[in-house]
């Protein structure tokens, strides 16, 4: 999954979270808004992360388009990055800090990998 999926409704959010849960796939979600310059600035960096971490599903959520999801997950500032496993938020990072986001994504994806013992 080397791309960022744009979430445009609560239904699409629920669909992708459910799919990821069924496939044991971690989710990194970027909550953004068009009026938030730091958030918009992070979009290309977020796409780069999605390209480099193919084991995770990367979702982008415009809080003005999908208010109910942002509200349900208590997203109050942009940008907010949420890390979900099995449909549950495991970590949250608020702010446009590329180094910290990359570090968190790396640790999160590594810890989410399933080890298969033959």
Swiss-Prot record:
Its main location: cytoplasm. The keyword Cytoplasm applies. The keyword Chaperone does not apply. InterPro entries: Thioredoxin-like_sf, Thioredoxin_domain, Thioredoxin_H-type-like. It is found in: Cytoplasm. Ubiquitous. SUPFAM superfamilies: Thioredoxin-like. It comes from the Eukaryota. One of its GO terms (molecular function) is protein disulfide isomerase activity. PROSITE patterns: THIOREDOXIN_2. Residues 2-110 form the Thioredoxin domain. Keywords: Cytoplasm, Isomerase. It holds the Pfam family Thioredoxin. One of its GO terms (cellular component) is cytosol. Belongs to the thioredoxin family. Possesses low disulfide reductase activity, but efficient protein disulfide isomerase activity. Does not possess deglutathionylation activity. This is Thioredoxin-like protein CXXS1. It comes from Arabidopsis thaliana (Mouse-ear cress). The gene is CXXS1.
